[in-house]
Curated annotation (Swiss-Prot):
Primary location class: cytoplasm
GN (gene name): AGO3
Entry's localization field: Cytoplasm, P-body
GO MF entries: endoribonuclease activity, cleaving miRNA-paired mRNA; metal ion binding; miRNA binding; RNA endonuclease activity; single-stranded RNA binding
Chain ranges of the PAZ domain: 230-349
Region annotated Disordered, chain positions: 824-847
Name used for this protein in its record: Protein argonaute-3
């Protein structure tokens, strides 16, 4: 993959992504199956045409119907027996050339419209180029290097795109496409999520260039859709009303606001016009009920009179509204004042829910979709058999053959590291299947807590004083056993109410108790208090806080208290464990800094809230301690805009902590999709270099830039049943794959560094986009597994992505709480998307700024 210049041609040198340095050999070999299916492709040229449809900006579904109608209509004169495939946007491929002039051809097409009228379209088709699948074979076998393999260009001459379009054409016509997945309405099953939403099951399908061959990645998929039902019923679900007949009065303001939030933007169809089911998009819910909501009605004599919606429906349709006391939907454009009573509207089928699911809905979704690895393996195999690619006329047209057996892959299970604890015995723990026990062990470096406070935001009735006393006694016992002694009783223990009392209470504590190390905050469930505690503690006053849910105070368990101690120790500067020094990889022989970076974006459809970029850096030689830096930036921007200054801050902090300058920088970048690789690498690699040079003119540490991807659909299964681990039958922690299903020539690998508890384990995909340090495959895979996955402070388990990338995600997520505007926070609890609308960039930047006393700690743990 070549990385071109962002400026004028030749202004910057090309950046070349490193080729694979060889294959890993370390670890115990294991036989695996991957949900990748080989696609045999002929060595032929296919023909690419650019399609332009007017009117434009139609959904892909409509574009597909237009092109399908056009192909049928011009079958005799143009298309003959050819079966073209189309990507729904601009690219159409044929196996044989079309008889059209080089200048192109303009054609007419129609689709049936509402009310019996046809919708006319103009379609222009123009030849672009031949696309060579022979060249693709050359690339896959390593005989030639291609242009970047991208799937996102509007008109792509990339042969991979052509393969993808062929295999997606028929499913796109049969099912509801969402991204790279296909869904169909539930038949024979029902998985309601509540709130008018339900689970739809489907399958993911994408083509991947792999070693020597093309692979088709197939996986089961699920997402939330809105239930097709009467709007009245939808409103009842949203507002938790069991029977609308029990709602004789108009909706309250809070009910109206809640229902507006849920239904705005959805399509509804009317039921009062017989078979003519006209569709509208909802823009609002009226304040007034149908019996009082008026609009200007023009009579036949030209006179305009005011009519209520209820009157109009009675006069025009002889329809006496059953619920005139309920509001109306305002549909179409707001300025046009088109109102529909709720009772004549249905939610249109097939609308995906892009809004954030509630906690309960997320929990229901996980339960409905979690499958053990063997079950998922069987379901994927069934999906491939039922797809019946050998009978797909478009697959046949282009002479493809899709094998229906999963790819056989040889993986390796990397050895787990030995972890050093502290205390007199300096005990060593060896993880088994990604898990180890801390019982009988003490933190490597435990903190002594001499002054601490408790703020209880649960009511005294919920959490009585004797319960608090029991909790603190047990916490002190567990913490002492863990080598983090908490001395005496808390210097302050008071009840409080509401988010407004957080800041004055914390200020009082800071001013009254010099040397206060920790405030333990007890929360009464999901509440805005949490966001305010973190805002005040992290950004305003620089105080360490640890929140605990009241249910865990009332019913304590050694496990919960032990997990609390893991967090508290590192927040106060302690170290939980380290890799046994003699086992550390050779990269640690010189100063090395591990950086993790992530950008979190606001929920879909919310363009006003900012994206948040976070970078963390290791601050010791273990690496165990980390510092963080965070910035707000333009919504939905993936490149970290201020990366140079963020990395500079962390390099300075590393030097202050260790008195060394790193000779190597290992940069784990989360959240980047393949289509963004070139752009993000080009900008961010230069930013890291700029940070180094800004500190010292000749300072050029070796940089290794690795993208960590979790949002993919590759799954690995044990070929040998006896090697399955746990109740879910997953692959062992440490399983790595860098052959067969990986990139034909670039440096990438899959690593499952954690033990799957529920459902099927998802291995992380690592793609090395830059490597000054010339790591071997073994070195980088071991570095990613041993120190990076086993030093995450929240638990005594190895985690699914490297600790620095995980911490960056936590920092960005915490910053969302810092941006919550407490005055406008909803009663639903700390809604992490924030309430930052309308605040200027300077105010947002200031709100996200961490207090100087907190900055050097792992406050985000």
């Amino acid at each position: 993959m070549e990385i071109g210049s962002a400026g004028p041609v030749g202004a910057q040198p090309l950046l070349m992504v490193p080729r694979r340095p060889g294959y890993g050999t370390m670890g115990k070999p294991t036989k695996l199956l991957a949900n990748c299916f080989q696609v045999e492709i002929p060595k032929i040229d296919v023909y690419l045409y650019e399609v332009d449809i007017k009117p434009d900006k139609c959904p892909r579904r409509v574009n597909r119907e237009v092109v399908d109608s056009m192909v049928q209509h011009f079958k005799v004169t143009i298309f003959g027996d050819r079966r073209p495939v189309y990507d729904g946007k601009r690219s159409l491929y044929t196996a044989n050339p079309l008889p059209v002039a080089t200048t192109g051809v303009d054609l007419d097409a129609t689709l049936p419209g509402e009310g019996g009228k046809d919708r006319p379209f103009k379609v222009s088709i123009k030849f672009v180029s031949r696309v060579s699948w022979h060249l693709l074979h050359e690339v896959l076998t390593g005989r030639t290097l291609p242009e970047p393999l991208e799937l996102d260009k509007p008109i792509s001459t990339n042969p991979v795109h052509a393969v993808d379009v062929v295999l997606r054409h028929l499913p796109s016509m049969k099912y509801t496409p969402v991204g790279r997945s296909f869904f169909s309405a539930p038949e024979g099953y029902d998985h309601p999520l509540g709130g008018g939403r339900e689970v739809w099951f489907g399958f993911h399908q994408s083509v991947r260039p792999a070693m020597w061959k093309m692979m088709l990645n197939i996986d089961v998929s699920a997402t939330a859709f809105y239930k097709a039902q009467p709007v009245i019923q939808f409103m009842c679900e949203v507002l938790d009303i069991h029977n609308i007949d029990e709602q004789p009065r108009p909706l309250t303001d809070s009910h109206r606001v809640k229902s507006t939030k849920e239904i705005k933007g959805l399509k509804v169809e009317v039921t009062h016009c017989g078979t003519m089911r006209r569709k509208y998009r909802v823009c609002n819910v009226t304040r007034r009920p149908a019996s009082h909501q008026t609009f200007p009605l023009q009579l036949e004599n030209g006179q305009t009179v005011e009519r209520t919606v209820a009157q109009y429906f009675r006069e025009k349709y002889t329809l006496q509204l059953k619920y005139p006391h309920l509001p109306c939907l305002q549909v179409g454009q707001e300025q046009k004042h088109t109102y529909l009573p709720l009772e004549v509207c249905n939610i249109v089928a097939g609308q995906r829910c892009i809004k954030k699911l509630t906690d309960n809905q997320t929990s229901t979704m996980i339960k409905a979709t979690a499958r053990s690895a063997p079950d998922r393996q069987e379901e994927i195999s069934r999906l491939v058999r039922s797809a019946n690619y050998e009978t797909d006329p478009f697959v046949q047209e282009f002479q493809f053959k899709v094998r229906d057996e999963m790819a056989h892959v040889t993986g390796r299970v990397l050895p787990a590291p030995m972890l050093q604890y502290g205390g007199r015995n300096r005990t060593v723990a060896t993880p088994s299947h990604g898990v180890w026990d801390m019982r009988g062990k003490q933190f490597h470096t435990g903190v002594e807590i001499e002054m601490w406070a408790i703020a209880c935001f649960a009511t005294q009735r919920q959490c009585r004083e004797e319960i608090l006393k029991g909790f603190t006694d047990q916490l002190r016992k567990i913490s002492k056993d863990a080598g983090m002694p908490i001395q005496g009783q808390p210097c302050f223990c008071k009840y409080a109410q509401g988010a407004d009392s957080v800041e004055p209470m914390f200020r009082h504590l800071k001013n009254t108790y010099s040397g206060l190390q920790l405030i333990i905050v007890i929360l009464p469930g999901k509440t805005p208090v949490y966001a305010e505690v973190k805002r005040v503690g992290d950004t305003l006053l620089g105080m360490a806080t640890q929140c605990v849910q009241v249910k865990n105070v009332i019913k304590t368990s050694p496990q919960t208290l032990s997990n609390l101690c893991l967090k508290i120790n590192v927040k106060l500067g302690g170290i939980n464990n380290i890799l046994v020094p003699h086992q550390r990889p050779s990269v640690f022989q010189q100063p090395v800094i591990f950086l993790g970076a992530d950008v979190t974006h606001p929920p879909a459809g919310d363009g006003k809230k900012p994206s948040i970029a976070a970078v963390v850096g290791s601050m010791d030689a273990h690496p165990s301690r980390y510092c963080a830096t965070v910035r707000v930036q333009r919504p939905r921007q993936e490149i970290i805009q201020d990366l140079a200054s963020m990395v500079r801050e962390l390099l300075i902090q590393f030097y202050k902590s260790t008195r060394f300058k790193p000779t190597r920088i290992i940069f784990y970048r989360d959240g980047v999709s393949e289509g963004q690789f070139r752009q993000v690498l080009y900008y961010e690699l230069l930013a890291i270099r700029e940070a180094c040079i800004s500190l010292e003119k000749d300072y050029q540490p070796g940089i290794t830039y690795i993208v960590v991807q979790k949002r993919h659909h590759t799954r690995l299964f044990c070929a040998d049943r006896t090697e399955r681990v746990g109740r879910s039958g997953n692959i062992p922690a440490g399983t790595t794959v860098d052959t067969d299903i990986t990139h034909p020539y670039e440096f990438d690998f899959y690593l499952c560094s954690h033990a799957g508890i529920q459902g099927t384990s998802r291995p992380s995909h690592y793609h090395v986009l830059w490597d000054d340090n010339c790591f071997t495959a073994d070195e980088l895979q071991l570095l990613t597994y041993q120190p990076s996955a086993h030093t995450y402070v929240h638990c005594t388990r190895s985690v699914s992505i490297p600790a620095p990338a995980y911490y960056a995600h936590l920092v960005a997520f915490r910053a969302r709480y810092h941006l919550v505007d407490k005055e406008r926070d909803s009663a639903e609890g700390s809604h992490v998307s924030g309430q930052s609308n309308g605040r200027d960039p300077q105010a947002l930047a200031k709100a996200a700024q961490i207090h100087q006393d907190t900055l050097r700690t792992m406050y985000f743990a």
